[in-house]
């Protein structure tokens, strides 16, 4: 197993992800090679909570253009983690 800091990159802060916190669901950008088992273990280790469910989404990079040059942003992976009832992640409390 990889280190938890290598699996979880940063939390997703958006209007939709902040709304999911009320349902005890937290969103993170994760490593594109990470699987659900590694994501679950990383969240449980870093935040000392019990994970009930992990859902992942592969987000394709967007096409970007500067003048005549066309490029792409990097592909990313997002994980939505559902915690056991009563568990909370403290860093998200103020959102």
Swiss-Prot record:
GO MF terms held by the record: rRNA binding; structural constituent of ribosome
Xref: PANTHER family: 60S RIBOSOMAL PROTEIN L23A (PTHR11620)
Gene source species: Desulfitobacterium hafniense (strain Y51)
Protein name as catalogued: Large ribosomal subunit protein uL23
Assembly information from the UniProt record: Part of the 50S ribosomal subunit. Contacts protein L29, and trigger factor when it is bound to the ribosome.
Domain of life: Bacteria
Family affiliation: Belongs to the universal ribosomal protein uL23 family.
Source species taxonomy: Bacteria, Bacillati, Bacillota, Clostridia, Eubacteriales
Gene Ontology biological-process annotations: translation
Annotated keywords: Ribonucleoprotein, Ribosomal protein, RNA-binding, rRNA-binding
Function: One of the early assembly proteins it binds 23S rRNA. One of the proteins that surrounds the polypeptide exit tunnel on the outside of the ribosome. Forms the main docking site for trigger factor binding to the ribosome.
GO terms under cellular component: ribonucleoprotein complex; ribosome
InterPro entries in the cross-refs: Nucleotide-bd_a/b_plait_sf, Ribosomal_uL23-like, Ribosomal_uL23/eL15/eS24_sf, Ribosomal_uL23_CS
Any Pfam family: Ribosomal_L23
